[in-house]
């Protein structure tokens, strides 16, 4: 089967690699550098499994800048373009998705379009009405950055949307796509759910909001424990051994961040509109309170320093260990709060060559020099290369994992 994938981020590329084991896949992107890397067997993103599969597996995959040619020949078109949250309108920016839909429909009269981008509840219905076609369906992704292909190989569940009154072809394509994902997976007995588009859209947003809820819950627990000088580690262990709660997703942090949780929680809150709720709004608020609290704690530690020059060293901007993503990283908001107090910031981030021009922080990518300059080293996730300056480190990373 010929499949086109719009977007070579961690969602699009992981799906492209997965499906190219048994199908002919063309990845479409607007960046020549990404296209060149993929065509040379290199991954443009950090993902151990994607890197290995591109290098070592027999894949039928290519990348192109020629979107129309790719879409024209495809039987299925997977759309995995960004949908960033627009704080001005309090809604996802879906213009890239809509642009691809319009382009595909203009050159291809038979392909079914499968949206993998995270979208607002009701978006598929809106697009079907706008473009007067039922050939647009949704399949939510449940992937972790840097582990996207692994999560496609070992999925927790597969969800594809389909409506009762859809044409036989669209129904067949929805089932076919679910089967493609299931047959490519290494995990046995993966649950497959076919449901309405709005229900599938809701699953994605509510699932991520629940994960944000867990992060916020354990962060508030940690705030209480630190404020009362209690052992946060022991409290969390004591709670988490309850099977109903579980010893997972319970490690305190500076706040949830990354590409998905911040925008998905805000979008779900926007979708509620006039529907009664308090919890969803509280999750978003809790995350902001946590970041403010962390900044305050750092300032308090600085005040105890005898040095006349106060320098905060930020160790890594990445949100998670082994990630290459800084988007919506909680530490960036903490930095902004500290800078508003005229505190000098130096940053160690080896994945950056320079900071944005308006950033008043200083990039120090010589680790030993960074350690010497900083009065206090702040890190969301602890790394063993800080072991020799452990007495300088402020982190709420209790379990040494994400």
Curated annotation (Swiss-Prot):
The keyword Transmembrane helix does not apply. PANTHER family: UDP-GLUCOSE 6-DEHYDROGENASE, UDP-GLUCOSE 6-DEHYDROGENASE TUAD. It catalyses: UDP-alpha-D-glucose + 2 NAD(+) + H2O = UDP-alpha-D-glucuronate + 2 NADH + 3 H(+). SMART domains: UDPG_MGDP_dh_C (SM00984). NAD(+) binds at residues 2-19, 29, 34, 83, 118, 145, 263, 327. Belongs to the UDP-glucose/GDP-mannose dehydrogenase family. Changing residue 260 to A/S: Loss of activity. Its EC number is 1.1.1.22. The active site is at 260 (nucleophile). It comes from the Bacteria. This is UDP-glucose 6-dehydrogenase. Pfam families: UDPG_MGDP_dh, UDPG_MGDP_dh_C, UDPG_MGDP_dh_N. Changing residue 141 to Q: Increases Km for substrate 3-fold. Increases Km for NAD 2-fold. Reduces catalytic activity about 10-fold. GO terms for biological process: polysaccharide biosynthetic process; UDP-glucuronate biosynthetic process. Keywords: Capsule biogenesis/degradation, NAD, Oxidoreductase. Catalyzes the formation of UDP-glucuronic acid which is required for capsular hyaluronic acid synthesis. The keyword Plastid does not apply. Substrate binds at residues 142-145, 204, 249-253, 257, 319-320, 402.
């Amino acid at each position: 089967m010929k499949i086109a994938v719009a977007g070579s981020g961690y969602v699009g590329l992981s799906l492209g690699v997965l499906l190219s084991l048994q199908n002919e896949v063309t990845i479409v992107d607007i960046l020549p550098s990404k296209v060149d890397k993929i065509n040379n067997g290199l991954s443009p993103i950090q993902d151990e499994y994607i890197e290995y599969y591109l290098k070592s597996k027999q894949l039928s995959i290519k990348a192109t800048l020629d979107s129309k040619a790719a879409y024209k020949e495809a039987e299925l078109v997977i759309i995995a373009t960004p949908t960033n949250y627009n704080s001005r309108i309090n809604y996802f920016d879906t213009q890239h998705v809509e642009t691809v839909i319009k382009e595909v429909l203009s050159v291809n009269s038979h392909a079914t379009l499968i949206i993998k981008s995270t979208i607002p509840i009701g978006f598929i219905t809106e697009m079907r009405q706008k473009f007067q076609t039922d050939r647009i369906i949704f399949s939510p992704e449940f992937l972790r950055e840097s582990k996207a292909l692994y999560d496609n190989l070992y999925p927790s569940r597969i969800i594809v949307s389909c409506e009762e009154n859809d044409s036989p072809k669209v129904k067949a394509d929805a089932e076919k796509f679910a089967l493609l994902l299931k047959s490519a997976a290494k995990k046995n007995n993966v649950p497959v759910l076919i449901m309405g588009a709005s229900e599938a859209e809701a699953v994605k947003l509510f699932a991520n909001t629940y994960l944000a809820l867990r992060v916020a819950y354990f962060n508030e627990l940690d705030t209480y424990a630190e404020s009362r000088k209690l052992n946060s580690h022991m409290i969390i262990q004591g709670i988490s051994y309850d099977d109903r709660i579980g010893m997972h997703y319970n490690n305190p942090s500076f706040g949830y961040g990354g590409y998905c949780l911040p925008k998905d929680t805000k979008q779900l809150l926007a979708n509620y509109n006039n529907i009664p709720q308090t919890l969803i709004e509280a999750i978003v608020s809790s995350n902001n309170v946590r970041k403010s609290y962390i900044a305050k704690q750092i300032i308090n530690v600085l005040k105890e320093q005898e040095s006349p020059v106060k320098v905060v060293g930020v160790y890594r901007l990445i949100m998670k260990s082994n990630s290459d993503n800084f988007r919506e990283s909680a530490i960036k908001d903490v930095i902004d709060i500290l800078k508003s107090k005229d505190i000098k910031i130096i940053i160690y981030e080896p994945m950056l060559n320079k900071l944005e021009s308006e950033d008043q922080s200083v990039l120090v990518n010589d680790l030993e020099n960074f350690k010497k300059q900083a009065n206090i080293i702040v890190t969301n996730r602890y790394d063993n290369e800080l072991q020799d300056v452990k007495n300088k480190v402020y982190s709420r990373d209790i379990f040494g994992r994400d």
